[in-house]
């Protein structure tokens, strides 16, 4: 990121026009360009542009001490050759400004999308910086939308949900859109800031209140650094649904309200890794084509006063969440597990600290009631048992410190199982789902115990 500045660009957006003045490095040539469009009350000011003589990358190593050596994944690696710096004017602090603030920020993000959707800007990263402050946000049921090649910088900023609609604060796909594979808006960066959901706006007795806060689906290269998500209502603070190459570093997740939706105890993970299988698993993210989340790094994050920390409670027969690194995180005061996961493969869980949790690490190849968690493929036939790959294997759980609140519960559970439910009994009834190639080493279990079953080399 620290490279010679080859081009200076200044611009001001006001009303319906954007004027760019490009000053070449020698300072001898000037050009002006006007781009038509409506941006409501927003003002977007271009404060600089950088062109690099070699392709650049942005990754976790730019924001924390992760160096990538020996890691099962590097997470997000975002390449670019140009960086355009933009700032937003028009956000207002104080009560009653939520709708106006939403319009300002959504308009600014949409304006950036006019450029990022064009092929000529395919290798340009646009950094949109918000001024420090606490801003109410009311999308009247609609989230903000983050588009291709956009970096939202929020140091010193709190975006506070001021409505009681069960809607996310941010997502990467417009309502009504459909994508396959990892082809939705990608190369997305969030740095700094607080995304706040005031839990007092919602009713724990409600049978309807539930939503996730930050939602990403069908995409690749998502990077969060120094982000705080405060509060979630029977959903996920961060939902990764069919995401390839993601890094979440030095971020904080806290606050959870369990409502009566599906009854109390409907356990949810703060960071969910999921598969795009159906509209119940992945609402709002068609096409439902079993695009799975893989190559994820979660490093140096804090999880407190939650249900579960990281993982997921859905899986598809024959598909695995692969290349996952969960390292150097802290989990405290959880009513569920620090990590709860199905069908993980090539996963490294190391140097995490868990204290006052209901369970530490739970990695499963089959649950006790698989019909509640495992699905047939969205497309094609259910795989025959002898054609299934090993769904959970190459798991390393090392150098963790775990203190379970109730010492009678397991600190670490590594388990396969025997299928005994009804839905897929013809194909899988009585068959054993094994976990293979597990490494447990140097874990300090201060309370609780270790369970391994249906595990083999």
Model-derived features with residue positions:
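Right-handed parallel beta-helix/beta-solenoid
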Residues: 39-106
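Right-handed parallel beta-helix
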Residues: 155-158, 183-197, 220-231, 244-259, ...
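N-terminal Sec-pathway targeting helices
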Residues: 2-14
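Right-handed parallel beta-helix/beta-spiral solenoid domain characteristic of secreted/periplasmic
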Residues: 48, 62-66, 93-103, 151-211, ...
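Short, T/G/N/S-enriched strand-turn elements that build extracellular solenoid repeat scaffolds
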Residues: 106-121, 136-148, 179-182, 218, ...
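Sec-dependent signal peptide cleavage junction
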Residues: 22-42
């Amino acid at each position: 990121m620290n490279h010679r500045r080859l081009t200076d660009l200044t611009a001001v957006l006001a009303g319906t026009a954007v004027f760019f003045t490009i000053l070449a490095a020698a300072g001898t040539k000037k050009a002006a360009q006007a781009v038509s469009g409506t941006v409501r009350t927003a003002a977007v000011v271009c404060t600089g542009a950088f062109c690099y003589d070699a392709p650049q990358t942005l990754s976790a190593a730019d924001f924390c001490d992760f160096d990538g050596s020996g890691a099962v994944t590097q997470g997000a690696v975002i390449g670019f050759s140009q960086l355009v710096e933009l700032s937003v004017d028009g956000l207002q602090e104080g009560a009653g400004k939520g709708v106006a603030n939403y319009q300002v920020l959504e308009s600014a993000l949409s304006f950036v999308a006019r450029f990022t959707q064009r092929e000529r800007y395919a290798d340009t990263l646009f950094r949109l910086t918000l001024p420090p402050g606490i801003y109410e946000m009311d999308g009247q049921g609609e989230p903000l939308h983050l588009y291709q090649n956009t970096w939202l910088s929020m140091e010193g900023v709190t975006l506070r949900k001021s409505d009681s609609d069960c809607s996310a604060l941010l997502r990467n796909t417009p309502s009504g859109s459909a994508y396959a594979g990892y082809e939705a808006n990608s190369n997305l960066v969030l740095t700094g800031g607080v995304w706040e959901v005031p839990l007092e706006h919602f009713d724990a007795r409600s049978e309807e209140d539930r939503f996730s806060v930050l939602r990403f689906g069908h995409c690749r290269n998502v990077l969060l650094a120094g982000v705080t998500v405060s509060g979630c209502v029977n959903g996920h603070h961060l939902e990764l649904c069919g995401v390839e190459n993601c890094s979440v570093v030095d971020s904080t997740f806290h606050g959870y309200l369990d409502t009566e939706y599906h009854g109390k105890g409907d356990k949810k993970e703060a960071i969910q890794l999921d598969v795009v299988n159906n509209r119940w698993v992945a609402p709002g993210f068609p096409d439902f084509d079993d695009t799975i989340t893989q190559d994820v790094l979660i490093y140096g994050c804090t999880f407190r006063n939650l249900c579960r920390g990281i993982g997921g409670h859905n899986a598809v027969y024959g598909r695995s969440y692969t290349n996952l690194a969960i390292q150097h995180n802290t989990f405290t005061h959880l009513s569920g597990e620090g990590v709860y996961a199905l069908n993980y493969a090539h996963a490294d869980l190391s140097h995490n600290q868990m204290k006052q949790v209901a369970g530490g690490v739970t990695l499963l190849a089959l649950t006790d009631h698989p019909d509640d968690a495992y699905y047939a493929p969205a497309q094609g036939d259910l795989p025959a048992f002898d054609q299934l790959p090993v769904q959970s294997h190459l798991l390393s759980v090392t150098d963790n410190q775990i203190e379970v609140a109730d010492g009678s519960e397991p600190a670490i559970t590594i388990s396969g199982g025997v299928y005994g439910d009804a839905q897929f009994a013809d194909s899988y009834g009585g068959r054993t789902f094994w976990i293979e190639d597990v490494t447990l080493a140097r874990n300090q279990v201060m309370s609780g115990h270790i369970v391994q079953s249906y595990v083999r080399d």
